[in-house]
Amino acid sequence: MKYDSLADLVLEAEKQNLPLCKLVLKDQSEASETDETVLFENMKRSLTVMRDSVETGLDGQKRSASGLTGGDAFKMNEAVKANKNICGKIFGNAMVKALAVSQTNACMGRIVAAPTAGSCGILPAALLTISEDRNIPDDEVVMSLFTASAVGLVIANKASIAGAEGGCQAECGAASAMAASALVELCGGTPKQSEHACAIALKNILGLVCDPVAGLVEIPCIKRNAMGVANAFVAAELALAGVESAIPADEVIYAMKKIGEAMSPALKETAEGGLAATPTGKKLCEKVFGHC
């Protein structure tokens, strides 16, 4: 399969009466001439790294090498455990995990780029949160990663997953779309509903710029991961309820590509615009590097 159209993937899944994850695993096995069991075990290792990166990021004492960030996941976790958060248990735990993984990345810890390091907290936060809440077996979570990967590959092929090309909409947007699609499948949705979840999640983040303070993947990147996982749950919830995207996923992806092309280079990972160019952003840059 070419992985250049989500609609085509869904059509093929429906034709073969398979969930997206099994279609993708079967195709990848044939394309790479590798046994499905081997591919599954490889993906399972990624899930293990994701889970470990959550635990690492919950350490309230760790700060990034720059000193700009650290401890937010710990603070959020304490609020959730004390039942002081306003968004409920699932949203609270998802935000905790997204912050934790992103913080692990900022501290140079081991993470899974899903699809990028800058958006690494969104997918694991979504899948680990729902699996814990619903007692979903790890094997099912691993399979959902194949669905997420296929969605990410379509976005990469049709547009981009790089902030330097498409802004943060390409990174956190892609991750949120991947997570939403996988959430739908984990919760018993159809391939078509996964497609709608992808479209809804991505169009909610269209236009989001990449403006890292001091050029580091910390401010505002870490908190944007919390936003991205919340958006994934919103999109999945809507899709599972039967809400459909008026604009097909493939067209939303293309729109994201065109928006990225229209963005100023100052808003695509160069740290020359947006939050990076604010007075405070510049002061933080000087604090880290001595100049800005």
Where are these regions (language model features)?
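Glycine/serine-rich anion-binding loops at beta->alpha junctions
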Residues: 103-128, 169-174
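Glycine- and small hydrophobic-enriched segments that form the cores of compact globular domains
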Residues: 86, 113-120, 132, 136-143, ...
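Acidic-glycine-rich active-site phosphate/pyrophosphate-binding loop
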Residues: 89-105, 140-159, 204-212, 247, ...
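Generic N-terminal targeting/processing segments that precede catalytic cores or assembly contacts
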Residues: 1-109, 133, 242, 249-292
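Alpha-helical support elements that line or immediately flank enzyme active sites
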Residues: 124-135, 180-188
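A structural-propensity feature for long, helix-poor, extended segments
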Residues: 146-178, 182, 204-231
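Conserved active-site and cofactor/substrate-binding residues in soluble primary-metabolism enzymes
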Residues: 37-49, 63, 89, 93-96, ...
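Functionally critical mobile loop/hinge segments
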Residues: 185-292
